[in-house]
Amino acid sequence: MAISANTLFHFTSKYDTLISILKSKFFLRLCLERGLWHPGNRKWAVPIVCFCDIPLSNMAEHTQKYGNYAIGIKKTWAIKQGVTPVLYVHDNSSFIGHGLDALNWSLELGEKDSEHLNERLAQVMSMFFMMKPYEGYQERDGKRKKVRFYDEREWRYLPPIGGDHLNFLTEEKFNDKTQRDSLNTYNEQYGVDFNPDVINYIIVEKEDEIVPLIHELYSIKGNFSHNSVELLSSRIISMDRIREDF
């Protein structure tokens, strides 16, 4: 069995969020993460859309952390949109040291050319935002658990880098709801739009959610033609069924 799939899955824990994506697009949302490159692993809020490259047969554990609803898109299409696999590193990886050198170099240049400091900083930071630890601790629902992030086979979409507007926040600013909501709203312009043809799967939690979802498909997104809905209806599957059959 292939380890890698031809589909990238974006998971969510809520049915309403699944419908919202189908109505519009994949929106960037700030995600608070520890900076591998920062002394003390300070947290930063990163605007990303996350996907995973795992087959249906390996989804059970993933859904426990990220939800029982998902949209699976064609990997070939995602690559054309700039969706990229993350780089998994450990404490002894030379990439972290090289990255710190690049960050310090950018800051030194920024002191000489303050007009372009934000842009230089964002370019280097975007490199770090595509890194994740090979393994580490994940905080969820007030609990801290050691996990191997490498097993998630994560892919990410980040917003374009450029201009004077920084797309990320420190943890302190992220905890300020006004600043967090403002940047999430700003980043909506960079969301990943799609059409029905690139969807390989729509996953719901329960079998009895399939028919209501088909009814939703007929009423959302103007470019969902009758034929598209017929096609998408055949691509809906429940997590209950996946757990039983795969």
Tell where the protein language model's regions lie, with residue ranges.
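NAD-dependent ADP-ribosyltransferases
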Residues: 1-246
